[in-house]
Structure formats: structure tokens, C-alpha cells
Amino acid sequence: MSDFSPREIVSELDRHIVGQGKAKRAVAIALRNRWRRQQLQGHMREEVLPKNILMIGPTGVGKTEISRRLARLAGAPFLKVEATKFTEVGYVGRDVEQIIRDLVEVGIGLVREQKRKDVQARAHLAAEERVLDALVGANSSSTTRDAFRKKLRAGELDEKEVEIEVQAGAQGMPMFEIPGMPGAQMGAVSLGDMLGKAFGGRTKARRVLVKDAHPLLLTEEADKLIDQEATTQEAIYAVENNGIVFLDEIDKIAQREGRSGADVSREGVQRDLLPLIEGTTVSTKHGPVKTDHILFIASGAFHVSKPSDLLPELQGRLPIRVELEALTRADFVRILTETEASLVKQSVALMGTEGVTLDISPDAVEAIADVAVEVNSTVENIGARRLQTVMERVLDELSFTAPDRSGETVSIDAAYVRERVADLAKNADLSRFIL
């Protein structure tokens, strides 16, 4: 769990996302409160519950991007899901408890990766011994092994092919649902899980280069040194206390006014979400998981429906409400130039791989922003995503001919941009911009 201060979290988000200060502050405070709760002891620690967040704002203003960046910052089990993917319990489809099962798998992956780093030195030596066994045999003399070990570490044997024994494992085994046992009880059952012990001791021979053998064996040796039971328990603890779920497209499951009749992917899903967000115990194949202290961040554009169309109980379980503002022309210019991996920087880097030096002038950036604003206002406002479409149109010809122009420097100014998107700016052909 990261211990960034709210100011540091906002500063980190500012590197990638323009504007939306209120939303950044809300998620920063929520993330810091996770750390604060960990510092409490005993009864008070159990009593402090997370304040779940509802982010409201038009499409393309940064709701999903905030969640993506937050996941990297959190250092905690984090899962982003679309609310529209779930159906009411009892119907065909995924029920909402699958969210927690998926979150546990994310947690196990995080903890296992950390434990692999902890045992990396020992695993490295064990993997090296297995490569030496493949090169000179298990019964070779220590003198021979030492000589080959030096060559191996010097990289002299990298291109030599060896045959190694690796775990056959049960990966790739099919998944199936047990009839009469819906996901609420156990979820999809993997044959690999059921037959894991039977397959656990099986190995298969593979012929690989020495340089490729070491990474393969390193992961295998690290997993041998890890206590899998302890890993699972640690992961469940991390999920229960630090887990974060980002529920996107929550507006799509709101029951709109004037509609009646059953809809298994709308109100039923909201009802199923209530206990999950309030706090319940979900059965997983790794054991029961309590959701009381999992933080839920919901977001939606609410173009057609309103937040008040959600069930009142669900609204009450999302007490912190943040509205994100629509982006302006000035925001578009900043998105193109100031963010760490802006579209301009990405385009320059991509053309650089072809040996083409791309120079996009400031007035070209202004022109791209102008076109994006104009098309957003006349067709459909899809926010910052419009910039990607305009940028692709501007660079379309160059992207196609770049392999033939290696060594050239291509300058793009406002006139070049207007020439490429002239028909679009005049509303002559907007079909390419309707996503």
C-alpha cells in the first residue's frame, strides 16, 4: 500500500491528466484514508469504513484515465470493471460477486510478484545450477562446472541450445460452470485447479537457447521457494483491507424514468451491488472474502439517465459525489503538449522508429485543438478522445509513407493541419469522426 500524501497523489495525476482538480482531490483523500486506517488499532480500525465515490462527468474528460493512473499509484489490489458486463443473480451471465473473485486473483498476482522479488537471489542461483546441469550434466566435476559458470555469467554461452525440464503445469485447461451451482457459489471452475496435484509433478522437455532458459527457470525456482498458502492468505488480507474497485459506466444500469418491466442487467444489478458495497462475505475458491473495507469508485457520464435514477440505497452507499467539468480548448492544447505521454510526444516517438524526425509546431497544436473543439460541438462531444481522431487524420499520409522517408525531417504547421482536415472543418465529411 503506497503512503503518498494527497498532495503527492494529485501531483502524480497532474502529470497525465489535465484539469479535474475536484476528482483528483477526492480520489487522493480516499487513497490516503486507506493508509490512515492502517495506522489505527483494534476496534476503531474495524469501525472506519471507506467513503465510496461517485464521479459524474461527460465522456472523454478523464474519469477512466484517473482510475488507470490511480491503479499504478495505489500499490494495492485494484480492479476496473464495467457495470454493464453483469447480470442479476440467477440469470445467465456474470454476477457482481465475480468482481471480488477477480480482485482476489489480482491480489494474489501482486503478492506473488513481491515474494518473487524477495527470493530472487536464491532463485537466481538455483536456476543457474539447472542451466549448468543441462550444459554439462548433473554429475560433472566442480572444476568443469566452475569453468562453465564463468562462461555462462560472461554471456559466452547465450546462443547455445540446451534441453531443459520445465513444469507441464495445468495452465490452459478449460473452464466450465457446474450445473446448478451459479457463480454466486463458486464461479467458473478450472480443470487445472481440480487436477492441480495430479499435474503438479509432471514436467516436459523444451529445447531453448541458454539466454532464454534462465528466465523460464527463474520463475519456476522462485515459485518453489514461495509458500503458496501464505501468499493466498496475504492476498486476501490485502484485498479486504486495501482493495479498490472502479465501477465504470454505472449510469448504464440506472433505471430511466418512464421505463417499466424487468431488466436483468439494470435494476437487478443495482440491487446485487448493494450488499457488496455495504459489506458482505463473498465465497471464492481461495476462501471467504469480506468486502466491508473495499473502496468502490463508481463513474458514469449520465447523458441519458441522472444520478437520481439509481436506487436510493445505492446513492446512499456512494456518499462522495464529484462532478468533472467538460474540457475547453485550452485544456485540449495542454493535453497535446503538457502531459507526460501526450499525443504529440507519442507521434514524434513513433515516427522516430522509421527514422523520420517529426516537428509539430505550437500553431499546429492550436489548430488541432480548434478542429477537435469544432467537431465536438457540431457532431457529438466525446471530449479528449476527439484529439486522437483528429491527430490520426493529420498524420494519415505521413504514417503511410514514413518507411520511404527515412532520414527526412517533416514539419507540421497550422497550414498543414488545416489542409488535412479542411473538409472536416467545413462539416463536409464528418463520418470519420463519428465513433
Swiss-Prot record:
GO cellular-component terms in the record?
HslUV protease complex
* UniProt KW ATP-binding keyword: yes
Positions that bind ATP: V18, G60, V61, G62, K63, T64, E65, D248, E313, R385
Read off the InterPro entries from this record.
Answer: AAA+_ATPase, ATP-dep_Clp_protease_ClpX, ATPase_AAA_core, Clp_ATPase_C, HslU, P-loop_NTPase
Q: One GO MF term, please?
A: ATP hydrolysis activity
Keyword annotations: ATP-binding, Chaperone, Cytoplasm, Nucleotide-binding, Stress response
Q: What top-level branch of life does the organism fall under?
A: Bacteria
Show the disulfide pairing.
none
UniProt subcellular location: Cytoplasm
Protein's GO biological process: protein unfolding; proteolysis involved in protein catabolic process
Q: What is its main location?
A: cytoplasm
Give the matching CDD domains.
RecA-like_HslU
Q: Which HAMAP family match?
A: HslU
The UniProt subunit note reads as follows: A double ring-shaped homohexamer of HslV is capped on each side by a ring-shaped HslU homohexamer. The assembly of the HslU/HslV complex is dependent on binding of ATP.
The entry sums up its family as follows: Belongs to the ClpX chaperone family. HslU subfamily.
Q: What does this protein do?
A: ATPase subunit of a proteasome-like degradation complex; this subunit has chaperone activity. The binding of ATP and its subsequent hydrolysis by HslU are essential for unfolding of protein substrates subsequently hydrolyzed by HslV. HslU recognizes the N-terminal part of its protein substrates and unfolds these before they are guided to HslV for hydrolysis.
Q: What is this protein called?
A: ATP-dependent protease ATPase subunit HslU
Source species of the chain: Azorhizobium caulinodans (strain ATCC 43989 / DSM 5975 / JCM 20966 / LMG 6465 / NBRC 14845 / NCIMB 13405 / ORS 571)
Supply the gene name: hslU
